[in-house]
Amino acid sequence: MIAFVFPGQGSQKVGMGVELAEASAAAREVFGEVDEALSQNLAKLMAEGPESELTLTANAQPAIMANAMAVAKVLEEGGFHLAEKGDCVAGHSLGEYTALASVGAFSLTDTAKLLRTRGIAMQDAVPIGLGAMCALLGADLEKAQALADAAAQGQVCEVANDNDPTQVVLSGHMEAIDRAVELAKEHGIKRAIKLPV
């Protein structure tokens, strides 16, 4: 079985897509179409930053999708079509939208606009600097919930995603998430990583 899984938010970084754009006209076309759809030079933001702007949800989501779609187009340029060769496509959170676009369920333009709208809605729900997320590695749901309860201290700190039997994501107030990262080892959790969201 061949499966293609697309990344979710938190996988963005300044410099993403630069080598693809330099090496492939198909990748440049993807970045150009997304820029046009958003009336923004997102490709430049992806290439040069600043990181603080790229990490904003309204920018990060379409940027991650554009980068993944550029990879898909480079594969297609080489004769490897995901919709034909893959048995399935999937994505982690926002990657689900990329998966749909990669097999033609959504157009690239519509996906970029949808993710911009989704990103703005998510950003507006929690003002910048108020919320945060962390991934807990080596944590089951029970340990993650106990850590969230200990870290909350009157603030919000909740289990957000149960990714697999050994990885859970917490979200909540920034201070509570910072406490969770500090307390993780005391709760028998191998590692806690604050996510760039």
Task: For each feature predicted by the language model, list its residue ranges.
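Patatin-like phospholipase
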Residues: 17, 28, 41, 65, ...
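Residues that mark the start of a beta-strand
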Residues: 1-2, 132
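Helix-rich "cap/lid" substructures immediately adjacent to catalytic or cofactor-binding pockets
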Residues: 2-90, 170
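Alpha/beta catalytic cores of group-transfer enzymes, especially the acyltransferase/condensing modules
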Residues: 9-12, 36-38, 103-197
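A short small-residue
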Residues: 47-54, 98-99, 194-196
